[in-house]
Amino acid sequence: MASAVGVAVRAGVPKPDIGSSEALRTTLLTAKSIGYSTGPSGDHVVSLIERFGITDQIRPKLKQVPTGVRMETLLATGEAEIGFQQISELIRAPGIDYVGPLPSEIQKITVYSAGIPSNSKQPEAAKALVSALAAGDAAPVIITVWSRPDPLGRWA
């Protein structure tokens, strides 16, 4: 399974232009506040801001989602005008509208994998779970939970 970085806004507000790197840069500069998550997607957003050369202008507007708080909370309450997080976390969140994935030329895909620790107390049960998740029969359940089978949030 994999998930890309996506963009969301509070439900019902106009969706910003994120169709290109330059459009995203402009959107970041004009946003009043910017939410980003912890982990790889948040690190990637910070690196993009640095790459765009707008760190000094953006830093005062950045709001990192605290551990245990979801991005939709910041967006729905207006603490963040625009938010960045794994698409799998944004796609079904209440109170927000998913805008879309980052442009492909600046996208970062996070791949999720499963393994069985060598010191597992129940290696056979773990192997059965991993096998079940990898089986084609699991796809409908995974799609329901993740909403989209494609890491960029598109229907395959």
What residue spans do the PLM features occupy?
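Exported/periplasmic ABC-transporter solute-binding proteins
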Residues: 1-156
